[in-house]
Amino acid sequence: MSRVYNFAAGPAMMPEEALERAAAEMLSCRGAGMSVMEMSHRSAMYQEIFDRTVRLLRELMEIPDEYEVLLLQGGATGQFAAVPMNLLKTGADYVDSGNFAHGAFVEAQKYGNARVIASSREESYARVPDVDAGAIDPDADYVYITTNNTIYGTRFTRLPDCGKVPLVADMSSNILSEPYDVRDFGVIFAGAQKNIGPAGLTV
């Protein structure tokens, strides 16, 4: 069988070694006599798999201990609501740099005072808009960006200076493709399917 090379934005190709191991363990994961899909999420073996996954992600991204790592069901668009539902109290500033950033802003408006502080929407998102530090509300609950835009081929080459306002970043299309200092962010989230795993999981 010849493999098809998929250059779409996602779901992306997965390493053949990972697929072969998953296939080999589909009926019996690590000799357990059952598939990982059949395991209780409270079982010792599942906990071991979970802990190792989190440990490897911490190692690869150099995630400090003061940050939690969550493995969540569903795609990253679910976080468009989860972020404001958990963080938006008085107001949030959004950088409208593409389709997904705009969708996140529209969703946030349902939960409180969200405003766009920089946008390239009128230019069909041909570039990432410049973010003037003076435009950021120092009392905002957070500033929201999408670090990379696969649809338009644009990315943030320099993070906005948010002062003491937490920076929230959707890294779905470039997580683990370039180094970031996690301490520059209050929240990072990413759907797994573009860079680090199968569809249906968000970190």
Label the predicted regions:
Residues 34-79, 99, 106-107:
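Conserved N-terminal alpha-helix of the aminotransferase class I/II PLP-enzyme fold
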Residues 3-54:
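A glycine-/small-polar-enriched, mobile loop at the entrance of the PLP active site in fold-type I
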Residues 185-203:
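Active-site PLP attachment segment
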Residues 6-8, 69-73, 94-96, 116-119, ...:
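General beta-strand structural signal in soluble alpha/beta enzymes
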Residues 10, 108, 120-175, 187:
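Active-site phosphate-binding strand-loop segment of PLP-dependent enzymes
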